[in-house]
């Protein structure tokens, strides 16, 4: 570890405080500021779930769903899926036969529940715009063990990406989420024209699967960036400025939330694919930037 270690004793306790040279302190603060600059644009894109993605759900997404797709709009079905995911995770992680048996029973019960729910489907299910807000927290819970398994396997092989690289990958994944939205929007009317078409009864709508898939991708990007970013700040921040640097992370998040309005400014008379294209561009430029300074970030990490 760079720098000197200063020890102070108080009774039987010994506290070690890392002392950095002015040069090391400066390098770490600069590295953190570079990360803050990047995450601003991630949160700007990610928090479109409360703005343009909700507009899209309200104005361009089908108002009903049938068949297997409709099961995603029942919270109990989502809970069953979570039980299956964690049951599988436990099944492969357990070292005793009893634990594996319990995990297997949980999985079978959840599958039986889903099978029963599917057989009981009758007609269509209404789909309102606010219901799409359930998918981000659902995917956070469901994907956490998946991401742990992936990076655990990479770590055992000595190939796990560093925290700064995960942040860059998170930006690329976020870009992929809005690329999905671009594909879903080709051929659609502008929001203003869609509003007129809805009033005239001639509007066309897209499948809810587009938004569900986008939330899936964006949530995986969040799992790459958010916990890794906080961990990076905690690890790299100079001891004297740790609180300030952690505050800087939340300031960057707040600025990103404020900038979500940029997409709303062009929502109206612009083709939808251009709106999503702006967000794709922001994420890609941010990813290119963080990979261009990766050596500086990994040096202090």
Q: In which residue ranges do the predicted regions lie?
A:
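Membrane-helix interfacial "entry" motifs
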Residues: 19-28, 125, 129, 203, ...
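Intracellular loop-helix junctions on the cytosolic face of multi-pass helical membrane proteins
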Residues: 1-124, 147, 151-157, 297-301
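Membrane-embedded alpha-helical bundles of multi-pass transporters/translocases
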Residues: 35-44, 49, 131-234, 239-295
């Amino acid at each position: 570890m760079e720098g000197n270690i200063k020890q102070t004793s108080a009774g039987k306790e010994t506290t070690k405080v890392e002392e950095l040279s002015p040069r090391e302190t400066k390098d770490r603060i600069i590295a953190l500021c570079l990360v803050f600059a990047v995450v601003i644009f991630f949160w700007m894109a990610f928090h479109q779930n409360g703005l343009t993605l909700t507009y899209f759900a309200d104005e361009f997404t089908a108002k009903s769903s049938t068949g297997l797709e409709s099961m995603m709009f029942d919270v109990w079905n989502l809970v069953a899926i979570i039980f299956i995911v964690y049951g599988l995770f436990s099944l492969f992680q357990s070292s005793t036969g009893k634990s594996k048996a319990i995990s297997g029973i949980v999985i079978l019960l959840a599958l039986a529940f889903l099978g029963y729910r599917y057989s009981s489907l009758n007609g269509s299910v209404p789909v309102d715009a606010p219901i799409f807000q359930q998918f981000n927290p659902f995917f956070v819970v469901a994907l956490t063990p998946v991401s742990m398994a992936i990076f655990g396997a990479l770590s055992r092989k000595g190939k796990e990406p560093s925290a700064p690289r995960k942040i860059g990958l998170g930006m690329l994944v976020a870009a992929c989420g809005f690329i999905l939205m671009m594909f879903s929007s080709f051929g659609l009317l502008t929001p203003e024209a869609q509003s007129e078409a809805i009033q005239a009864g001639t509007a066309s709508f897209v499948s809810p699967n587009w938004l569900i898939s986008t939330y899936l991708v964006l949530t995986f990007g969040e799992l790459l960036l958010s916990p890794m970013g906080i961990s990076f700040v905690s690890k790299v921040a100079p001891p004297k400025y740790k609180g300030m640097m952690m505050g800087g992370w939340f300031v960057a998040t707040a600025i990103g939330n404020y900038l979500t309005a940029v997409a709303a400014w062009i929502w109206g008379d612009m083709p939808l694919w251009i709106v999503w294209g702006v967000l794709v561009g922001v994420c890609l430029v941010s990813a290119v930037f963080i990979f261009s300074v990766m050596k500086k970030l990994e040096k202090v990490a």
